[in-house]
Amino acid sequence: MIKINALTKSYGEYPVLQDIHLQFYPGEVHGIIGENGAGKTTLFKCLAGLEDFKGSIEYDGGVLKNQTGFLPTIPYFLSKMTGFEYLKLLCNAREILKPDIEKYNLFQLPLKQYAETYSTGMQKKLAITGLLLQKNEVFILDEPFNGVDISSNMIIHEILIRLKQLKKTIILSSHIFSTLQDSCDFLHYLKEGKIKKTMSKGNFATIENEMKTGQLNTNIIESLYSS
């Protein structure tokens, strides 16, 4: 289990996250939903051990960052490194010395090509493949469906189901409600650095309706064409 207690993060005098309290259990898929700038990426960086913060994060499985696979919104790749070399590097970091990389090339990527030449979607798929090969217990995926084609989205969704069955802890983010509603067991609505609402599956519409509040009044569009 991962337990976040009173997590607060500021950049200078600007508060990004304020008094976050959350719990994540194995075998559950949690979604962090919120508009751009709500603090989702900062929260994920805190969980992944990449940002300092006030408060605490407890994990009963050992050192959290040693068990965590983190997918950033835009994965980073070293220059002149092939897809195969990238995956091997990630495996070596977890002391997985002889990974069967070709067997687990789920997205049929051209692993002999330089990763930096991949499209945005291909790079994201390569990064996800690397996290799976590492055999992580916790998966923190920042906007995993963005920039990926429909068929690959379906594969990612199936991967999430399998990881859930294997009792892994999965935390996703998105600023688009529809990308999370089918994959997640719980949704946490993050707004202006605060968790405004948490809902279990079956009650997600409550969050969707709250997110719609204050959005564009479509009557404005109609009035443009009627004037």
Give the ranges of each region predicted by the language model.
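Conserved structural motif at the start of ABC-family nucleotide-binding domains
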Residues: I2, L17-D19
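The feature captures the beta-strand-to-loop junction immediately N-terminal to the Walker
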Residues: I33-E35
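Conserved ABC transporter NBD signature motif
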Residues: D52-N66
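Hydrophobic anchor residue at the start of the ABC signature
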Residues: I128
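Catalytic Walker B motif of ABC-type/P-loop ATPase nucleotide-binding domains
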Residues: F139-E143
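Helix N-cap at the start of a conserved alpha-helix in ABC-type nucleotide-binding domains
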Residues: I150-S151
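H-loop/switch region of ABC-family ATPase nucleotide-binding domains
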Residues: S173-H175
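Conserved beta-strand-loop-alpha-helix hinge in the C-terminal portion
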Residues: K194-T218
